[in-house]
């Protein structure tokens, strides 16, 4: 009996590093410009305003053998908004819209992942923007992963969703309906820790 228990314990101990390799922690590589948070919103129905948030941090866990256990956490410096027009940025960041003085940070914390096909799925989570937290669902796709030229290991993903600005107490009622929602797009590489 002792021999069987010892063998089972040694086998479990030997397999533990393999499990740890699979369920890896990654830091999003926003510092080296391998990650982007972008948005697109209609301008009066005539064209689009496209912008980015340039300053953010985040991490995620990813196990290709247990996709349901994937998790993501991202923090965004709202003041890093950039639409390539300084006066417009100032207005968007003002109390008229994002009120960055009162709400300097936005965040996303995942609550679940549901695979839907080869490298694709639905990521659910809580998005906090303008001091309001709402559940969202984001369509995501695994772009790829592997070793990088610097001795690290990376995984890359992209995702998108649509947000109703009124859900975050951002008053856009004086604008046409086409300006009351925006498309959010994220793409990032994570470096395994």
Which stretches of residues belong to each language-model region?
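Low-complexity, acidic/polar, glycine-enriched regions of mature
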Residues: 22-193
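Gram-negative bacterial Sec-dependent N-terminal signal peptides
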Residues: 1-22
């Amino acid at each position: 009996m002792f021999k069987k228990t010892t063998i089972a314990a040694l086998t479990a101990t030997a397999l533990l590093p393999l499990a740890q390799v699979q369920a890896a922690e990654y830091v999003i590589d926003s510092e080296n410009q391998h990650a982007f948070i972008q948005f697109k919103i209609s301008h009066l129905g005539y064209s689009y305003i496209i912008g980015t948030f340039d300053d953010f941090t985040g991490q995620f866990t990813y196990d290709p053998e247990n996709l349901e256990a994937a998790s993501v956490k991202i923090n965004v410096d709202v003041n890093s908004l950039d639409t390539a027009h300084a006066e417009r940025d100032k207005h968007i960041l003002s109390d008229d819209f994002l009120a960055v003085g009162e709400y300097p940070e936005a965040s996303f914390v995942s609550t679940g992942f549901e695979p839907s096909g080869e490298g694709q799925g639905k990521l659910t989570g809580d998005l906090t923007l303008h001091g309001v937290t709402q559940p969202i669902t984001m369509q995501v796709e695994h772009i790829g992963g592997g070793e990088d030229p610097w001795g690290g290991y990376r995984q890359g993903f992209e995702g998108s969703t649509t947000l109703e600005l009124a859900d975050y107490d951002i008053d856009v009622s004086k604008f046409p309906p086409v300006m009351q929602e925006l498309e959010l797009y994220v793409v990032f590489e994570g470096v395994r820790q």
